């Protein structure tokens, strides 16, 4: 049944429409998965990024880690650190939204203290995106508590922890 599911996923056409002025998150996850090692561990945080990851990540022989439907925002950083400690020779990539990342970014200090190389992808949209999407559909665009105005400059956060940083702005920069 694994082969059957793989065939269905390969034939799946994502019909969602995204603003062409921004990076298409589904295409990004597909491209990212094609660049990852065969045995890589992909850690998906909670939110829209989790949905895009579940729909578009193509796993080879590694693992896909997520909290499922438990809604534990901030999961990806400590989970990735734990996986890195357990599997020091395996590529680890953690994908999260800007809200989730901020919920446990202090754990970057732990990562640096123990010299644990992990790649983080922050899908930044300036909102608690999945909560905002729910409020859009359920409360007819009456939003409350979803804006992330005042978020830090993530390049400066990376610099403060001695981490490399790259900002992807357009779809043609993915390769």
Residue ranges: model-predicted function:
Residues 24-28, 38, 49, 104-107, ...:
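General structural feature for long, well-ordered alpha-helical segments within catalytic domains
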């Amino acid at each position: 049944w694994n082969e059957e599911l793989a065939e269905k996923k390969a034939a799946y056409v994502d019909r969602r429409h995204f603003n062409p002025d921004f990076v298409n998150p589904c295409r990004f996850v597909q491209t990212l998965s094609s660049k990852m090692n065969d045995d890589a561990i992909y850690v998906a945080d909670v939110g829209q990024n989790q949905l895009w990851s579940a729909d578009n990540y193509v796993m080879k022989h590694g693992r896909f880690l997520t909290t499922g439907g438990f809604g534990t925002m901030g999961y990806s950083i400590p989970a990735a650190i734990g996986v890195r400690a357990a599997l020091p020779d395996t590529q680890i990539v953690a994908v999260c939204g800007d809200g989730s990342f901020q919920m446990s970014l202090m754990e970057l200090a732990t990562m640096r203290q123990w010299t644990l190389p992990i790649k983080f992808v922050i899908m930044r949209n300036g909102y608690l995106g999945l909560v905002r999407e729910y409020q859009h559909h359920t409360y007819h665009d009456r939003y409350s508590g979803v804006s992330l105005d005042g978020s830090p400059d993530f390049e400066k956060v990376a610099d403060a922890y001695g981490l490399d940083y790259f900002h992807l702005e357009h779809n043609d920069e993915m390769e």
